[in-house]
From Swiss-Prot:
Fe(II)-heme a binds at residue 62. Its cofactor is heme; Cu cation. Na(+) binds at residues 41, 46. The keyword Transcription regulation does not apply. Pathway: Energy metabolism; oxidative phosphorylation. O2 binds at residue 245. SUPFAM superfamilies: Cytochrome c oxidase subunit I-like. It is found in: Mitochondrion inner membrane. It catalyses: 4 Fe(II)-[cytochrome c] + O2 + 8 H(+)(in) = 4 Fe(III)-[cytochrome c] + 2 H2O + 4 H(+)(out). Residues 1-12, 88-95, 172-183, 263-270, 329-337 are mitochondrial matrix. It is a multi-pass membrane protein. One of its GO terms (molecular function) is metal ion binding. This is Cytochrome c oxidase subunit 1.
Length: 337
């Protein structure tokens, strides 16, 4: 098998997982370089970069690189691809060629994001890309359009990956293995994939409407034509809040395995509680998004609902922390590195 065949046309979950890990490590260095620019600018009085726009471009790029090209490829693409098939005893992922496509959509997406910062004035919108700042007046030129296309590609990659993980985790188990016997990391990736599948299409709709507002004279987010910038915020945060749970849920799964192993236990404390806590967090994550929008003004009853729904997420989260501590309790903790 030639180098090209193995690494470019791979249908092997381990090779694709390795590609994700290498890509994520490289993107992580780019993201770290961007954060060093931010710290250098903020580390002393006066200016270093000299311009607010370039600073905002660096902050925006840092966020996108770290979220979409470091954390998600490593935790879902890397660890997910490597571990999910092994943990359920499957020969590979359910759709190996789609798995390869999910990976190879990421480098072009990354290229588009980097391109957005090198043309015109860059996309200095923040990772939320709110209009009217992201509109074609405040951000004339191709920068924001390139950033939107980058998000489109990364989104398609994640949706395909999510379909693959959901199908694999549910359908590729041996007949004797029930869903309640799969390891917690498998559960965490499954729930993460469901969140991706349900939230990303909404982001895609929002940024596509922004794209047409910028280029095709629509007014989805322009009050002059009967639109409303707050609509964009609802669409974005309906994705954006589940996204932060997408970033942490695989970490929950990893922590459960790490804590169990280093406590010298054969299983985590409260397996079913852990599973249902993750399911609850995933579900509740979809009905709390407007707490990111309190400053735009909201009806008192709406504020009361979103506040209390948000606080309820603390309960399953507390169950998880309690169970990790209970797993450690009474164990022979291994202190080796």
């Amino acid at each position: 098998m030639t180098f090209i065949t193995r690494w470019f046309f791979s249908t092997n979950h381990k090779d694709i997982g390795t590609l994700y890990l290498i890509f994520g490590a490289w993107a992580g260095m780019v993201g770290t370089a961007l954060s060093l620019l931010i710290r250098a600018e903020l580390g002393q009085p006066g200016t270093l970069l000299g311009d607010d726009q370039i600073y905002n471009v660096v902050v925006t790029a840092h966020a996108f690189v770290m979220i979409f090209f470091m954390v998600m490829p490593v935790m879902i693409g890397g660890f997910g691809n490597w571990l999910v098939p092994l943990m359920i005893g499957a020969p590979d992922m359910a759709f190996p060629r789609m798995n390869n496509m999910s990976f190879w959509l990421l480098p072009p997406s990354f290229l588009l994001l980097l391109a957005s910062s090198t043309v015109e004035a860059g996309a200095g919108t923040g990772w939320t890309v709110y209009p009217p700042l992201a509109g074609n007046l405040a951000h004339a030129g191709a920068s924001v359009d390139l950033a939107i296309f980058s998000l489109h590609l990364a989104g398609v990659s994640s949706i395909l990956g999510a379909i693959n993980f959901i199908t694999t985790a549910i359908n590729m188990k041996p007949p004797a293995l029930t869903q309640y016997q799969t390891p917690l990391f498998v559960w965490s990736v499954l729930i993460t994939a469901i969140l991706l599948l349900l939230s990303l299409p909404v982001l895609a709709a929002g940024i596509t409407m922004l794209l047409t507002d910028r280029n095709l004279n629509t007014t989805f987010f322009d009050p002059a034509g009967g639109g409303d910038p707050v609509l964009y915020q609802h669409l974005f945060w309906f994705f954006g809040h589940p996204e932060v749970y997408i970033l942490i849920l695989p970490g929950f799964g990893m922590i459960s395995h790490v804590v169990t192993y280093y406590a010298g236990k054969k299983e985590p404390f409260g397996y079913m509680g852990m599973v249902w806590a993750m399911l609850s967090i995933g579900f509740l994550g979809f009905i709390v998004w407007a707490h990111h929008m309190f400053t735009v003004g909201m009806d008192v009853d709406t504020r009361a609902y979103f506040t209390s729904a948000t606080m309820i997420i603390a309960i399953p989260t507390g169950i998880k922390v309690f169970s990790w501590l209970a797993t450690l309790h009474g164990g022979t903790i291994k202190w080796d590195p």
